[in-house]
Amino acid sequence: MNYLPQQDPQVFAAIEQERKRQHAKIELIASENFVSRAVMEAQGSVLTNKYAEGYPGRRYYGGCEYVDIVEDLARERAKQLFGAEHVNVQPHSGAQANMAVYFTVLEHGDTVLGMNLSHGGHLTHGSPVNFSGIQYNFVEYGVDPETHVIDYDDVREKARLHRPKLIVAGASAYPRIIDFAKFREIADEVGAYLMVDMAHIAGLVAAGVHPNPVPYAHFVTTTTHKTLRGPRGGMILCQEQFAKQIDKAIFPGIQGGPLMHVIAAKAVALGEALQDDFKVYAKRVVENAKRLAAALQNEGFTLISGGTDNHLLLVDLRPQQLTGKTAEKVLDEVGITVNKNTIPYDPESPFVTSGIRIGTAAVTTRGFGLEEMDEIAAIIGLVLKNVGSEQALEEARQRVAALTEKFPLYQD
């Protein structure tokens, strides 16, 4: 940064402190990652100046010939990555991508079947405090109380009973592979559309280390950050028959001008995801998650569903008589960032919770491997088994610092 320190030292200071925080702490929040310098450079480019309402070749402003190139690159790269017939890269977020699908196929009050938020779903899958739960009649499905795996018999039974117009698959805190073929089978049985929200697993899908929902779903939504390792934003993939409706739902339906600098960053990230080294990265993300899960179990922690198939895991802290809120706070004090998270059938409120959610996408980007997963689990065990012990916390801080110094981040 050459201009910001002089132009606005207060904003620069806050950004610099955040850069130092990201370097000094171990990032285990499952929805976060570290983008490349190229992605950041694209997002900070002159494209931030350009208004471009509409779509490539059909804009409502002049001077769009170069941003058209950028948006076409993003769309074509996404099609290639996921095997989609049509892609819209303009959604500002995953929530707006979901909203656009709802506006495409639903009317106010229509019935939708979605995953219970406390069982691993998302706010936009029907939470009563979200527009989705306010605008539509959401019926919830969840996980088996014993296995904590999606109960597909329950999904089928509720689909038959309520005859939803749309079924939503996908989650924000579900550590197992979702059977997309089973969901499509159920949707076809009751005449429903199927939407898959793959925001958390998109990078794993792109790399071929997780099943691809595109062949099964009428609509697939995603964020472009998380495991896809791009800028914060959204994207919709759909069958060609819905292309015009989806594009119209985004613009002029729920958005005006697209963020062309962000779309440029999406194009860069999608280009990165097409490379062989991204496939290696995604494979390591899953390997690290499985290793971390096993190491935490060796430390005596209980994992929801007994482990993980993707990049995230949920830890049930009730055996340790801890809340997620307490664990999040004390781990942050030693330099490990996680988030408190509800677990299935959680007796605590969403502001307290009985669990924490942990992900390996960011630490894998940083270069952490299997040995580091063992050490992270040991540090978490040290801290959560000795809450209130300053000696234990100080030891944990030193061990965290040793790891972060070994794998520097954004230091040049």
Swiss-Prot record:
Protein name: Serine hydroxymethyltransferase
Record localization: Cytoplasm
Catalysed transformations (reactions): (6R)-5,10-methylene-5,6,7,8-tetrahydrofolate + glycine + H2O = (6S)-5,6,7,8-tetrahydrofolate + L-serine
Pfam families from the UniProt entry: SHMT
Organism: Geobacillus kaustophilus (strain HTA426)
Site (Plays an important role in substrate specificity): 225
Modified residues (N6-(pyridoxal phosphate)lysine): 226
Complex and partners: Homodimer.
Family: Belongs to the SHMT family.
Assigned keywords, A-Z: Amino-acid biosynthesis, Cytoplasm, One-carbon metabolism, Pyridoxal phosphate, Transferase
Top-tier EC class: transferase
Domain of life: Bacteria
Reported function: Catalyzes the reversible interconversion of serine and glycine with tetrahydrofolate (THF) serving as the one-carbon carrier. This reaction serves as the major source of one-carbon groups required for the biosynthesis of purines, thymidylate, methionine, and other important biomolecules. Also exhibits THF-independent aldolase activity toward beta-hydroxyamino acids, producing glycine and aldehydes, via a retro-aldol mechanism.
InterPro entries: PyrdxlP-dep_Trfase (IPR015424), PyrdxlP-dep_Trfase_major (IPR015421), PyrdxlP-dep_Trfase_small (IPR015422), Ser_HO-MeTrfase (IPR001085), Ser_HO-MeTrfase-like (IPR049943), Ser_HO-MeTrfase_PLP_BS (IPR019798), SHMT-like_dom (IPR039429)
GO biological process terms, semicolon-separated: glycine biosynthetic process from serine; tetrahydrofolate interconversion
